[in-house]
């Protein structure tokens, strides 16, 4: 609903003091599936793009403001990152120390990447495990056991219309 859309933008604005180079939101809609909006620059750029949330349809969403650690600041590297099949959207704060090793393994399995980020590696790894076990919580558990470093993840999946999955280790996470 409209309140939820506005809350996603408002909560990103509250995080603005931390500094960032891009922002984005992913929202799940019954009619449109996962919709992802992201942009380089200040939060106002994203807000203008989606007319303050008025252009976004859905009732479940995740949002992120990014300070680049892997990959340059641009629209492609902005969060949320979406799995290859478009069913999973993920935001992440932290650093995945072994992301290059995981990326190389996924490349050998034919996975393609759009961004230069460790977060997209985590999103593609999640899709890989989800396709194997067909259970999102099990797939998330496999990802968390595989990655090294600090993280706070927010995850939504088109197959789970009312579920938001969150996990953290040594990084802050806001749920609201």
Specify the residue positions occupied by each region the protein language model found.
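Conserved short alpha-helical segments that host acidic/polar catalytic motifs at enzyme active sites
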Residues: 3-6, 10-176
């Amino acid at each position: 609903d409209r309140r939820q859309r506005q809350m996603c933008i408002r909560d990103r604005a509250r995080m603005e003091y931390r500094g960032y180079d891009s922002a984005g939101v992913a929202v799940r809609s019954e009619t449109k599936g996962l919709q992802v909006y992201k942009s380089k620059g200040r939060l106002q750029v994203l807000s203008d793009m989606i007319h303050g949330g008025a252009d976004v349809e859905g009732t479940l969403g995740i949002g992120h403001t990014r300070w680049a650690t892997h990959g340059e600041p641009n629209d492609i590297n902005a969060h949320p990152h979406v799995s290859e099949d478009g069913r999973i959207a993920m935001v992440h704060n932290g650093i995945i120390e072994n992301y290059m090793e995981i990326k190389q393994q996924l490349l050998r399995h034919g996975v393609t990447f759009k961004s230069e980020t460790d977060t997209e590696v985590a999103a593609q790894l999640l899709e890989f495990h989800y396709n194997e076990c067909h259970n999102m919580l099990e797939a998330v558990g496999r990802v968390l056991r595989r990655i090294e470093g600090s993280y706070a993840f927010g995850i939504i999946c088109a197959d789970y219309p009312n579920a938001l999955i969150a996990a953290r280790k040594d990084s802050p996470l806001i749920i609201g």
